[in-house]
Amino acid sequence: MQILVVGAGITGCSLAHLMKHKGHNVLIKEKQDHIGGLCYTTISPSGILYEPYGGHAFHTKDNRVKELVLKFSDFNNYRHNKGIVINSKLRHFPLSRETIRNMEDSEQILKELKERPKIPDLTNFETYSISKFGLTLYKLFIYNYSKKMWGLEPKELTTEYIRNRIELKNTNTHIFEDKFQGLPIKGYTELLRNMIHDIPLELNTIKFDESLFDLILFSGRIDELLKFEFGNLPFRSLLFEYQENENWENENYGTINLPQHPKYIRKVNFKIMHQQKINNTLIQYQEPIPAKNNKPPLYPIYTKENIELFNKYLIEACKSDKIIPIGRLGLYKYLEMGQAISLAMDMIPLIEEWKNLNYIDRYSEIKNLLSN
């Protein structure tokens, strides 16, 4: 088949490579002047590798994903350690009973944890969080962070983003427990460049003639694909600010969450994450903002209304015999990098059968894949 991939982010590049090596003719179009999408890596004037859309620690339990990325880059041995500032004190994150015992409200927090229901309350983001962590911890490290992050009261959100994302441990641990973790030695852009080295690539354009292709894998916004027929699907974005050679509280942490800061939600130390032996530092501060006025859409906002609107768009998109939505923006799904590649791999049978299915079966199969 003649296949066009629109978007050279991690999903687009992965599917382009996989479809090419299944014998299909593939072309990639990318609207930016570079590949990489949201995991694009570049280098600062002082020589520090960094990701302009936020620091990313790669991790996966999927051996298929591990084997694929290791074909195109060596990885450093960074394991994602994160700190969190609560009441002006730096603590380990995710919070553990070990950390809680040293907190001012430890007695009340431990009492609330003991009284938690056995089954979390899935009514909304807030009820789930309180039923998992108790009211005191919720107010300390979840409520303000989440309100800043999403621009909404947590009770307006569904549980999809937070469910199973944060777990309370007995002792301090890494954020991710996957055996395979790290960052590509030369960054994500180089990894993806190697992945698609044998595939034609056109930058600065995503215009295409549908008649020239058998299938088009579209990793842009699904609402944009359908010309915003049902209205705008809301996303959150981030505004990034940088400080060089600023003091960093603890060299064990690549990122530090700032739930009580009036503006920022977190800060990233790229030298630590990329494990560069260099004198300079580059700290990135992240401020959540609406994805408007050409700000990049980064995070789907999980409210009941938004999910219903996405489902409406997805049903309509599935009526096309040629164009298939993929990736975080096309499927309105928060995907970490390992998850994005894993989902891309899982979508291949659907992609190859797309023309033989009716739109209801296409829709059902995508929803099934997204629920895994």
Features from the language model and the residues they span:
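Short loop/edge segments at beta-strand edges and connector loops
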Residues: 7, 79, 199-206, 327
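Glycine-rich FAD pyrophosphate-binding loop
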Residues: 20-45
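N-terminal Rossmann-like FAD-binding beta1-loop-alpha1 element of flavoenzymes
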Residues: 2-28
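Dinucleotide-binding Rossmann-like beta1-alpha1 core, especially the glycine-rich loop
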Residues: 46-118
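Active-site/ligand-binding neighborhood in enzyme catalytic cores
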Residues: 87-215, 219, 223-226
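Conserved flavin/dinucleotide-binding core of flavoenzymes
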Residues: 95, 268-372
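Mid-domain catalytic core of redox enzymes
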Residues: 22, 206-316
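Short, solvent-exposed loop/turn segments at secondary-structure junctions
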Residues: 10-11, 33-35, 46, 98, ...
